[in-house]
């Protein structure tokens, strides 16, 4: 990748090369970079193209949103397949990354709620066949749109039925934002299918954290006590501390 492209995509306010995320969240958006980043869309360097898309979405840019619509709504084949893969599982992260970027652009720079919601609807439909880590959950949470409730619940249900309990638990916190009662029911389904295990516990804990009540407190205390659930137990502990209920 050419040095000038690296500066466009990865340099922070001081010119130090950092990463895509650091550029996505720059405040204010460096408008002088917009023409250069836009010019990378559709270019021969697929890595630069994919990262330019993520940057533009984070900045709330129309060119980025149009490109995301083309890819997610199936108007073109996914041009980024294999560009960024999960370091452990080797699965493609294209749509997870785009979902994260859409959430950032919505939160930070005013991407169109209605257009982003339409993309979220399509991504929820794709959740059984495309890998999502936390990107889809972040996007549905950022939208916090009640019209997505049934579809989010349906996506979680489909993942459970397909035996994808990790992915189901990762999406649970978004449902808690939309409908706490449904989230509790889906937690019960995940636990019935998988139990409270290393692959489900963090998602379950994050879901309880979004429903601050006495019942959630009890469940988080149980997770906190589970030494066999690293990550989830420390998250539960931090949540309880934030609630002013840390254990001695």
Task: Identify the meaning behind each predicted range.
Residues 7-29, 50-60, 81-110, 133-146, ...:
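Structural detector for internal amphipathic alpha-helices that build alpha-solenoid repeat scaffolds
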Residues 88, 125-126:
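Short, surface-exposed loop/turn motifs that are enriched in glycine and acidic residues
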Residues 2-5, 28-42, 62-82, 110-124, ...:
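Amphipathic alpha-helical scaffolding segments comprising HEAT/armadillo-like alpha-solenoid repeats
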Residues 191-247:
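Long hydrophobic alpha-helical segments typical of transmembrane helices together
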Residues 44-45, 75-76, 128-129, 163-164, ...:
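Short inter-helical turns and helix N-cap capping residues of alpha-solenoid HEAT/ARM repeat scaffolds
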């Amino acid at each position: 990748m050419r040095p000038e492209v690296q500066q466009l995509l990865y340099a922070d306010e001081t010119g130090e090369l950092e990463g895509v995320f650091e550029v996505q969240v720059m405040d204010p958006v460096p408008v002088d970079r917009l023409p250069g980043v836009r010019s990378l869309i559709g270019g021969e360097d697929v890595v630069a193209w994919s990262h330019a898309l993520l940057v533009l979405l984070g900045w709330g840019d129309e060119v980025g949103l149009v490109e995301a619509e083309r890819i997610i709504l199936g108007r073109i084949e996914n041009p980024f397949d294999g560009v960024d893969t999960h370091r452990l599982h080797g699965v493609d992260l294209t749509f997870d990354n785009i979902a994260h970027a859409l959430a950032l652009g919505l939160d930070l720079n005013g991407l169109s709620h209605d257009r982003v919601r339409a993309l979220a609807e399509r991504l929820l439909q794709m959740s059984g066949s495309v890998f999502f880590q936390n990107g889809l959950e972040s996007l549905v949470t950022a939208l916090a749109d009640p019209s997505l409730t049934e579809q989010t619940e349906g996506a979680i249900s489909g993942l459970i039925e397909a035996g994808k309990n990790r992915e189901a638990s990762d999406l649970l916190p978004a449902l808690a934002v939309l409908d706490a009662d449904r989230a509790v029911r889906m937690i019960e389904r995940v636990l019935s299918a998988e139990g409270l295990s290393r692959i489900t516990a963090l998602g379950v804990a994050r879901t309880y954290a979004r429903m601050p009540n006495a019942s959630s407190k009890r469940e988080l205390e149980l997770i906190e006590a589970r030494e066999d659930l690293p990550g989830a137990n420390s998250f539960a502990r931090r949540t309880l501390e934030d609630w002013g209920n840390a254990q001695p």
